[in-house]
């Protein structure tokens, strides 16, 4: 039984590293891969206020510098966040 647990753990660890390598190349346009980012990424909705956010080490894609997530979760230039309306 302990051997099965060890083999299962090793398989999951290797699989996680293997899958993690593919995540880097699958980021959408205007996003980059990072191994550790905050749970609440900068967004157009949060631009006017600074929310309390706990930084967790979560790998994934984040908006590149100068871009924020819009209501459709797409990274857009900061200038497009409020097009057509005032702050």
Swiss-Prot record:
Q: Which Pfam families match?
A: TIL
Gene Ontology MF: a single term: serine-type endopeptidase inhibitor activity
Give UniProt keywords alphabetically: Antibiotic, Antimicrobial, Disulfide bond, Fungicide, Hemostasis impairing toxin, Protease inhibitor, Secreted, Serine protease inhibitor, Signal, Toxin
Q: Do you know which Gene3D superfamilies this protein is assigned to?
A: Laminin
The site (Reactive bond) lies at 55-56
Subcellular location per UniProt equals:
Secreted
Organs and tissues of expression: Specifically expressed by the venom gland.
Its domain of life? Answer: Eukaryota
**Residue ranges annotated for the TIL domain, each copy included:** 27-81
Predominant location: secreted
Q: List the disulfide bonds.
A: 27-61, 36-57, 40-53, 44-81, 63-75
* GO cellular component terms listed in the entry, alphabetical order: extracellular region
Q: Is Signal among this UniProt entry's keywords? A: yes
Signal peptide interval: 1-23
For this entry, list what GO says about its biological process.
Answer: defense response to bacterium; defense response to fungus; killing of cells of another organism
CDD domains per the UniProt record, alphabetical? TIL (cd19941)
What role does this protein play? Antifibrinolytic and antimicrobial serine protease inhibitor. Inhibits trypsin, plasmin and microbial serine proteases but not chymotrypsin, thrombin and elastase. Inhibits the plasmin-mediated degradation of fibrin to fibrin degradation products. Also binds to bacterial and fungal surfaces and exhibits antimicrobial activity against fungi as well as Gram-positive and Gram-negative bacteria.
Instruction: Give the similarity note.
Output: Belongs to the serine protease inhibitor-like (TIL domain-containing) family.
Name by which UniProt lists this protein: Venom serine protease inhibitor
